């Protein structure tokens, strides 16, 4: 990791991958935002944010996907820093922020939003602002519709149902830690492009969740959808064979996450997950093929 000007305490936080187990598009608001109904879990694999007090502000990036990250103020991490500083006042100390970028960019697993959420949480602690979750979520929502759910993921990690444009959050009980494989062949999809390609925007909401046990959860998921999948496939047809590959490797359930193009697969146990991950990585060098586990529901 890049060295910092060391002028005080430091904080490191995981910015977990956000996995949409199901995503139903139920309508569209007058302002253009789509109404969504989503079942979301968070993985133990993700980016990492390291922040410490410094003599001046700085931002550095490392990791396998660092090359695609903008270093200017258009970056969501810096937008989060500036938004929180605006709220807390001009006397807050300068900070050195380092992003370890382990997740593919524009891949449907919330990387940039999760990075911004982890930044808000870390700076809230480092600057001793003591803002509650609701205030941080309101600041996050001003930066992006999925910031509140990513803030929940970075703070708690527990599964949730997200509705509205993504800001209405409710915990979901009964979901165990899921052995999951995340796969992306390097395809990047811009979320606005996928939404523009939608042909149907009025769909049924999620059925009431039935999540007690992995088998029951996967049976439930087979009754759900990712309504963005047809639009994503129209832009990136290679998504479909990725899903077929995951099913052929023994997945209990496989689907695309978010607006794509990352796909995920749930496996029965650690052995099945490890075997599938190794086979796919060996057969497809250069792919992002990462075994992980989702965080479980609250006990």
Swiss-Prot record:
It comes from the Bacteria. One of its GO terms (molecular function) is ATP binding. Pathway: Isoprenoid biosynthesis; isopentenyl diphosphate biosynthesis via DXP pathway; isopentenyl diphosphate from 1-deoxy-D-xylulose 5-phosphate: step 3/6. SUPFAM superfamilies: GHMP Kinase, C-terminal domain, Ribosomal protein S5 domain 2-like. Keywords: ATP-binding, Isoprene biosynthesis, Kinase, Nucleotide-binding, Transferase. The active site is at 18, 146. ATP binds at residues 104-114. Its EC number is 2.7.1.148. The keyword S-adenosyl-L-methionine does not apply. The keyword Nucleotide-binding applies. Coiled coil: none annotated. It catalyses: 4-CDP-2-C-methyl-D-erythritol + ATP = 4-CDP-2-C-methyl-D-erythritol 2-phosphate + ADP + H(+). GO terms for biological process: isopentenyl diphosphate biosynthetic process, methylerythritol 4-phosphate pathway; terpenoid biosynthetic process. Transmembrane segments: none annotated. Belongs to the GHMP kinase family. IspE subfamily. HAMAP family: IspE. Catalyzes the phosphorylation of the position 2 hydroxy group of 4-diphosphocytidyl-2C-methyl-D-erythritol. This is 4-diphosphocytidyl-2-C-methyl-D-erythritol kinase. It comes from Brucella abortus (strain 2308). The lineage of its organism: Bacteria, Pseudomonadati, Pseudomonadota, Alphaproteobacteria, Hyphomicrobiales. The gene is ispE.
